[in-house]
Design a protein with these regions (language model features):
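Beta-alpha junction/loop-to-helix N-cap segments that form part of ligand/metal-binding clefts
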Residues: 12-84, 152-159
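Signal peptide-proximal N-terminal region
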Residues: 1-22, 140-145
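Aromatic/hydrophobic pocket-lining residues that form π-stacking "cages" and hydrophobic walls in ligand
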Residues: 2, 62, 104, 135, ...
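Extracytoplasmic "Venus flytrap"
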Residues: 1-3, 25-32, 54-57, 120-129, ...
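An alpha-beta-alpha
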Residues: 90-154, 173
Length: 191
């Protein structure tokens, strides 16, 4: 999409006669790589603006570099709280979990009759921790009881112990703020 847009803009004469040049780095969803990519793009490549990173964890680590350099950074799916409070050069186009989760919980309560839930979240990631914190507040506001709270770390593959505890707690549902790799395994093992 970016390349198509740049090609179209450049074919029409660019921006004020200047051609757009895209410089692409892959931060691989890792904080350290995001920091390295931002430093390279800002200080070596001298880019005027950054798009990304996609993950809140990477954004929280790398966006302060852009802010300090007064380089605009635009995150495309940074939903964790606190990202845009890094500074006035940090933007995002996605709503926060604090905005989404209360509506999601209210809908689940109304349509599914959920009265008590178990929570299984990744405790070593900004996105999943923020999701947990916001989910907890939304549950309290809807008066939904939490039967048990279990945690996992990014990269875990065996969730049997947590799922056994969740099952014995008698919840109506399970909330899993997490990424697809762990969430898919949790769903598979929960069956």
């Amino acid at each position: 999409g970016f390349q198509l847009a740049a090609d179209e803009i450049n074919a029409a004469g660019g921006v004020n006669g200047n051609k757009l040049v895209l410089v692409i780095e892959d931060e691989q969803g890792k904080k350290e790589e995001a920091i390295n990519a931002f430093k390279k793009l800002i200080f070596q490549d001298k880019v005027l603006m950054l798009f990304g990173p996609t993950l809140s964890n990477s954004a929280q680590a790398a966006d302060p570099i852009a802010q300090a350099a007064k380089t605009v950074v635009f995150g495309t799916s940074n939903t964790a709280d606190g990202i845009t409070s890094i500074g006035d050069h940090v933007f995002r186009n996605s709503v926060t979990e604090a905005d989404v989760l209360p509506v999601t919980i209210a809908t689940a309560v109304k349509k599914l009759g959920i009265k008590k839930v178990a929570v299984l979240y990744g405790n070593d990631d900004v996105f999943t921790k923020s999701g947990y914190d916001n989910f907890k507040k939304a549950l309290e506001a809807q008066k939904v009881a939490v039967t048990t709270t279990e945690t996992f770390a990014k990269g875990d593959v065996d969730f049997k112990a947590q799922l056994t505890a969740i099952k014995s707690a008698g919840a109506d549902g399970v909330f899993v703020p997490g990424y697809y790799a762990e969430a898919a395994l949790i769903c598979k093992q929960a069956r």
